[in-house]
């Protein structure tokens, strides 16, 4: 069942209550500070606040978790966003020369939005999202997770629900935070393989696939039939199939034959059309060249699996160290959903809503008894692991610095 999208989100007093009683400031502080004790990583961190009036205030920074909580409560923004760690506190920006304030580091971030899958989802459209089309996001998370772990060696990353129709990935490994803008673009280029969102032409990816792409294909193939051909069934619409499925094939004779067959036999399901491709190709291509046609057809179908299911990233979010991104546990102003940490098993209806949390608090006045607590626990466990790894990294750096200089050539 499709979730309806509310246009009347939380009120100013709702947000005031949320920041005062429910928002996990301490865990967010420890995450961004990489230590329970205030350090440069938090004191020099930029925060931006967005208000229901349309105002947007950048270059806020906080000295402690108490200051963080007090300032957010006082300002009561609709949401706040997290930016880079600078060489000086961003709040001092007006007293500095423009060249004096420099961004040093920030988490490597990725953003996946359902909009980029609209050509292939039929269960919902626009701002709507349900558990069926959310599978596109879950698969994108799976592929990205594998690349981050196996290809880049990152350990400390977490996904956060955007509150409506997307997900954000925060990579907090020390190596990732220190990436330059050029290096961030290099990582992006590696992961963002399917750059062309144009569905009316063939991908024609080079063979052999890069190992990452070959691995991704094997991860995605088991889901293609159930998600694309059965649940979404986008190509049952004959014109849509002619516009987005046929251009992915390589042979004009095959394309013309399929087009005629589908117009003569309308409303065949996506699964039937997928099988039609093989059957008509077999009848057309016989003799000594049949094997080469079979190989080309298989490659076209592999490209289609990747075109439909491979992660579609919002590239601007990843490119720059200074880019700001909405903080975890913010409230989406339109839906009232909490932007909670998630994993591949998440579905959007699992996200707690502020209105429900307020009802739970009225009964118990205890955050630990609300639907928010399991997500806070999940985030706390992530932060604890990050701090442990951060401490280990600092110790290794100190040990390296303490090693005596060698006279060996």
UniProtKB/Swiss-Prot annotation:
The bound zinc ion is not a cofactor. It is bound to a zinc knuckle motif that may be involved in sequence recognition and the binding of ssDNA. Present with 197 molecules/cell in log phase SD medium. The keyword Nucleotide-binding applies. Its EC number is 2.7.7.-. The active site is at residues 46, 111, 113. This is DNA primase small subunit. PANTHER family: DNA PRIMASE SMALL SUBUNIT. DNA polymerase alpha:primase is a four subunit enzyme complex, which is assembled throughout the cell cycle, and consists of the two DNA polymerase subunits A POL1 and B POL12, and the DNA primase large PRI2 and small PRI1 subunits. Keywords: ATP-binding, DNA replication, DNA-directed RNA polymerase, Metal-binding, Nucleotide-binding, Nucleotidyltransferase, Primosome, Transcription, Transferase, Zinc. DNA primase is the polymerase that synthesizes small RNA primers for the Okazaki fragments made during discontinuous DNA replication. In a complex with DNA polymerase alpha (DNA polymerase alpha:primase) constitutes a replicative polymerase. Both primase components participate in formation of the active center, but the ATP-binding site is exclusively located on p48. It comes from the Eukaryota. GO terms for cellular component: alpha DNA polymerase:primase complex; nuclear replication fork. Belongs to the eukaryotic-type primase small subunit family.
């Amino acid at each position: 069942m499709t979730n309806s999208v509310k246009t009347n989100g939380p009120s100013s007093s709702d947000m005031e209550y949320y920041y005062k009683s429910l928002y996990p400031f301490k865990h967010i502080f420890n995450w961004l500070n990489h230590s329970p004790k205030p350090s440069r990583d938090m004191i020099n961190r930029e925060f931006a606040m967005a208000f229901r009036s349309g105002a947007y205030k950048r270059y806020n920074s906080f000295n402690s978790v108490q200051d963080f909580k007090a300032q957010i409560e006082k300002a009561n923004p609709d949401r706040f966003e997290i930016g880079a760690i600078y060489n000086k506190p961003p709040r001092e920006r007006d007293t500095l020369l423009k060249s004096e304030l420099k961004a040093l580091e920030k988490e490597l971030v990725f953003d996946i939005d359902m909009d980029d899958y609209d050509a292939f989802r039929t269960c919902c459209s626009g701002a709507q999202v349900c558990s069926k089309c959310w599978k596109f996001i879950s698969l994108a998370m799976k592929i990205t997770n594998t690349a981050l772990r196996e290809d880049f060696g990152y350990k400390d990353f977490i996904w956060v629900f955007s509150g409506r129709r997307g997900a954000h990935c925060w990579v907090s490994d020390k190596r990732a935070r220190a990436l330059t803008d050029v290096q961030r673009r290099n990582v992006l280029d590696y992961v963002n393989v399917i750059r062309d969102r144009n569905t009316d032409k063939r991908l024609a990816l080079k063979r052999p696939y890069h190992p990452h792409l070959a691995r991704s294909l094997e991860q995605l193939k088991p889901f293609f039939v159930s998600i694309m051909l059965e649940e979404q069934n986008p190509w049952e619409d004959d014109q849509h199939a002619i516009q987005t499925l046929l251009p992915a094939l390589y042979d004009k004779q095959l394309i013309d034959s399929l087009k005629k067959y589908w117009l003569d036999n309308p409303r065949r399901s996506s699964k039937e059309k997928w099988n039609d491709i093989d059957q008509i190709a077999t009848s057309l291509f016989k003799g000594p060249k049949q094997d080469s046609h079979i190989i080309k057809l298989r490659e076209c179908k592999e490209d289609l699996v990747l075109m439909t299911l491979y992660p579609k990233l919002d590239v601007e979010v990843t490119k720059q160290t200074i880019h700001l991104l909405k903080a975890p546990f913010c409230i989406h102003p339109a839906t009232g959903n909490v932007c909670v940490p998630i994993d591949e098993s998440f579905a959007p209806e699992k996200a707690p809503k502020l209105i429900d949390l307020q009802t739970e608090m009225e009964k118990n006045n205890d955050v630990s008894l609300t639907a928010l607590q399991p997500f806070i626990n999940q985030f706390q466990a992530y932060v604890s692991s990050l701090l442990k790894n951060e401490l280990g990294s600092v110790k290794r750096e100190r040990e390296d610095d303490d090693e005596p200089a060698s006279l060996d050539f």
